[in-house]
């Protein structure tokens, strides 16, 4: 059985065009033939046709794109909803569920991975790793609470006592 490679290539291009544009196969074939099988040219023609209706295009039925990632069901409505979301985020405080869900990190997010602000010690340190007890000479700076007060030595004595118990 011999298959004409040119026909096969055209069929593959038609299928790709249908997937990319969301139109019918016969319309894809017409556009590709008109563009001399130049995929990008035909795709541009398809989207320019669907965006700029003119009198000559009303004689044949136009196939509008289906719901593809490139073409949402109703693009103006999607844009309006997106702009409302942005506006409502900036106008509402973060206690509203819509704004907090839109801006909140996921539940397993650890906010302490980031560095502390300059000229300020961290208020919380992550727990020591299981291998830390092997390295007694590595001491982490002690957190200061409240942030603007000076350490009195009490927490350091407690840490020294804990190190002695290990």
Swiss-Prot record:
UniProt-annotated stretches for the region Disordered: 120-166
Pfam family, any one: UBA_8
Signal peptide range: none
InterPro entries: UBA-like_sf, UBA_8, UBALD1/2
Family of this protein: Belongs to the UBALD family.
PANTHER family (UniProt xref): UBA-LIKE DOMAIN-CONTAINING PROTEIN 2 (PTHR31993:SF6)
Protein name per UniProt: UBA-like domain-containing protein 2-A
Lineage start: Eukaryota, Metazoa, Chordata, Craniata, Vertebrata
């Amino acid at each position: 059985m011999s298959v004409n490679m040119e026909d096969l290539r055209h069929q593959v291009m038609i299928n790709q065009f249908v997937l990319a544009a969301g139109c019918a196969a016969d319309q894809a074939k017409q556009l590709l033939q008109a563009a001399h099988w130049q995929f990008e040219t035909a795709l541009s023609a398809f989207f320019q046709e669907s965006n700029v209706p003119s009198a000559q295009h009303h004689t044949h039925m136009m196939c509008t794109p289906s719901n593809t990632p490139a073409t949402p069901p109703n693009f103006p409505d999607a844009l309006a909803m997106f702009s409302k979301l942005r506006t409502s985020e900036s106008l509402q405080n973060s206690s509203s569920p819509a704004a907090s869900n839109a801006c909140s990190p996921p539940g397993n997010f650890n906010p302490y991975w980031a560095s502390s602000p300059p000229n300020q010690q961290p208020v919380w340190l992550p727990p020591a790793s299981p291998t830390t007890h092997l390295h007694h000479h590595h001491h982490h700076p002690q957190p200061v609470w409240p942030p603007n007060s000076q350490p009195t030595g009490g927490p350091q004595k407690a840490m020294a006592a804990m190190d002695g118990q290990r």
